[in-house]
């Protein structure tokens, strides 16, 4: 059971609000007010390069059935869980319903919610927020590439700035986020 200060989502003495990250958020938090460095002992979550972003990158998202991989986390400098959630939505350019917040109701795309709730409760965090965007590939929202070859094939079609951004995203993804598709994508860009 949560005590009063946690149930209200307000930071009390010694209570931490944290963000989970696995992609560009880790190396480019933008407006997100992080406290200290990213920690490498985040929850293990089902992630894959499965969402084509507006700029053409194939980004890491929570993906049903994907191989679970370790994530990262950092403490945030906000006074309520809702403020941390709103800040992450702003950084991601996403609607609030696409940003998870625990404790609370699962986001629309709830993949990983149970694991995050268990991890957050076990650490005694006051609130945990994360990006809860769905896979999107080949114009289909909610579906990712069928396999690594399809993902690599898509990346092989990119040119110019889109190719540069996509290559940077794969290259700079945290080392511990070794998804099932990652080796094939690195080979596409000859990343070593």
Locate the predicted segments by residue.
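A glycine-rich, hydrophobic/aromatic-adjacent loop/helix-cap motif
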Residues: 2-192
């Amino acid at each position: 059971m949560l005590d009063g200060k946690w149930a209200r989502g307000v930071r009390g003495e010694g209570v931490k609000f944290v963000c989970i990250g696995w992609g560009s958020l880790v190396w480019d938090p933008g407006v997100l007010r992080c406290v200290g460095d990213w920690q490498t002992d985040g929850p293990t979550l089902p992630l894959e390069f499965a969402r084509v972003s507006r700029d053409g990158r194939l980004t890491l998202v929570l993906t049903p059935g994907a191989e679970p991989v370790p994530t990262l986390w950092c403490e945030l400098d906000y006074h309520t869980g809702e403020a941390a959630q709103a800040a992450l939505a702003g950084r991601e350019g996403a609607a609030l319903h696409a940003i998870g917040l625990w404790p609370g109701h699962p986001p629309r795309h709830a993949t990983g919610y149970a694991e995050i709730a268990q991890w957050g409760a076990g650490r005694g965090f006051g609130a945990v927020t994360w990006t809860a965007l769905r896979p999107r590939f080949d114009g289909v929202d909610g579906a990712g590439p069928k396999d690594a070859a399809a993902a690599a094939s898509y990346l092989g079609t990119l040119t110019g700035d889109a190719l540069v951004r996509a290559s940077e995203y794969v290259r700079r993804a945290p080392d511990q986020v070794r998804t099932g598709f990652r080796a094939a994508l690195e080979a596409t860009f000859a990343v070593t």
